[in-house]
């Protein structure tokens, strides 16, 4: 009997256990993995993907024409362990007839929790307060010391009322938010009804909101959306939060707005680039809280993401419907 030819799968990083187990149990696949928690160097990715039928990658892996050329004609499926797909050269992938799987929905709640945590941390100045306790700055009670801004009776503006934007609004509503505004490509009256959210223009949202949360996808239309003009329209008491993509924000303009007191504070879970250099001007500001892109970082969510990414890959290799396929 002629031996069955195995399909080669290349995985660009150590992924959580549930995804690893699913791939290991696939008798029709030969799995090779970059055995590190650190990003795979481009040259190693080119080497590893050569001849592969399937590629399981992460958001930090830039799958461009060079990588696709290195993979060759065997490559049939790319599965990314992310909801974002801006790291994939989609036009080139579509041209080659390669199917793409991704992991939406499973990280919605976790990312929304992080957004609310970051908003509260930023508006109530928690990092500053912790530092004052540690360095001896806490000497006595003072009427205005470390005063921040509260959510009760506030106006919250959400840029992008998609799955994550809605989940954020749902969690903020019990804090006594008086008014929700949102902006996007088009009104979403059915989704907005739950929060009585009003569809407004981006300039209106900037001018009227006490808190702004960016939760949109990165597209040509949203790249650099939050710039000098945007920040100049904001209230001086407003707090700006970004949990979408770093490139939605002009970080030089954000720095100027924060340093000059044009806006009160900002909290970022995403930056450009990632990681942000330790000498970046934003890191010198007390009124800017920056996290290392941990929106989906819970054990349960990351395991679920890895399993979905593995199942997408295996289904694609076998010519079956993927649990979550990106329509190209």
Curated annotation (Swiss-Prot):
GO terms for biological process: carboxylic acid metabolic process; dicarboxylic acid metabolic process; glyoxylate metabolic process. Pfam families: 2-Hacid_dh, 2-Hacid_dh_C. Transmembrane segments: none annotated. The modification Phosphoserine is found at residues 36, 272. Substrate binds at residues 83-84, 245, 269, 293-296. PROSITE patterns: D_2_HYDROXYACID_DH_3. It is an enzyme of class 1 (oxidoreductase). It comes from the Eukaryota. The record marks 274 as: Raises pKa of active site His. Keywords: NADP, Oxidoreductase, Phosphoprotein. The modification Phosphothreonine is found at residue 298. GO terms for molecular function: carboxylic acid binding; glyoxylate reductase (NADPH) activity; hydroxypyruvate reductase (NADH) activity; hydroxypyruvate reductase (NADPH) activity; hydroxypyruvate reductase [NAD(P)H] activity; NAD binding; NADPH binding; protein homodimerization activity. GO terms for cellular component: catalytic complex; cytoplasm; cytosol; extracellular exosome; mitochondrion; peroxisomal matrix. InterPro entries: D-isomer_2-hydroxyacid_DH, D-isomer_2_OHA_DH_cat_dom, D-isomer_DH_CS, D-isomer_DH_NAD-bd, NAD(P)-bd_dom_sf. NADP(+) binds at residues 162-164, 185-188, 217, 243, 295. CDD domains: GDH. The keyword Cell membrane does not apply. Ubiquitous. Most abundantly expressed in the liver. The active site is at 293 (proton donor). Its EC number is 1.1.1.79, 1.1.1.81. Belongs to the D-isomer specific 2-hydroxyacid dehydrogenase family. Enzyme with hydroxy-pyruvate reductase, glyoxylate reductase and D-glycerate dehydrogenase enzymatic activities. Reduces hydroxypyruvate to D-glycerate, glyoxylate to glycolate, oxidizes D-glycerate to hydroxypyruvate. It is linked to Hyperoxaluria primary 2: A disorder characterized by elevated urinary excretion of oxalate and L-glycerate, progressive tissue accumulation of insoluble calcium oxalate, nephrolithiasis, nephrocalcinosis, and end-stage renal disease. Homodimer. This is Glyoxylate reductase/hydroxypyruvate reductase.
């Amino acid at each position: 009997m002629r031996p069955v030819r195995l399909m080669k799968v290349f995985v660009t990083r150590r992924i959580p256990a549930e995804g690893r187990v699913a791939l290991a149990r696939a008798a029709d696949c030969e799995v090779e993995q970059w055995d590190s928690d650190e990003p795979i160097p481009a040259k190693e990715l080119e080497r590893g993907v050569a001849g592969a039928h399937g590629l399981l990658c992460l958001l930090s892996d830039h799958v461009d024409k060079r990588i696709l050329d290195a993979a060759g004609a065997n490559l049939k499926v790319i599965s990314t362990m992310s909801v974002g797909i801006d790291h994939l050269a989609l036009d080139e992938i579509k041209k080659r007839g390669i199917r793409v799987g991704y992991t939406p929905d499973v990280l919605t709640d976790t990312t929304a929790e992080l957004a609310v945590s970051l908003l509260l941390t930023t508006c109530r100045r928690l990092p500053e307060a912790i530092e004052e306790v540690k360095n001896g700055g806490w000497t006595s009670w003072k009427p205005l010391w470390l005063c921040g801004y509260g959510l009760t009776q506030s106006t919250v503006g959400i840029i992008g009322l998609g799955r994550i934007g809605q989940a954020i609004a749902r969690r903020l509503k019990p804090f006594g938010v008086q008014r929700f505004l949102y902006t996007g490509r088009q009104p979403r009256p059915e989704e907005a009804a739950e929060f009585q959210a009003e569809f407004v223009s981006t300039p209106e949202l900037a001018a009227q909101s006490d808190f702004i949360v960016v939760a949109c996808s990165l597209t040509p239309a949203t790249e650099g959306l939050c710039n000098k003009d945007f920040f100049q329209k904001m209230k001086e008491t407003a707090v700006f939060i970004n949990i979408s993509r770093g490139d939605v924000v002009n970080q030089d303009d954000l720095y100027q707005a924060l340093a000059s007191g044009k806006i009160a504070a900002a909290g970022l879970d995403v930056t450009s680039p990632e990681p942000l250099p330790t000498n970046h001007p934003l890191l010198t500001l007390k009124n800017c809280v920056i996290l290392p892109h941990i929106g989906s970082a819970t054990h349960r969510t990351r395991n679920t993401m890895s399993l979905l990414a593995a199942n997408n890959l295996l289904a694609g290799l076998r010519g079956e419907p993927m649990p979550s396929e990106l329509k190209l």
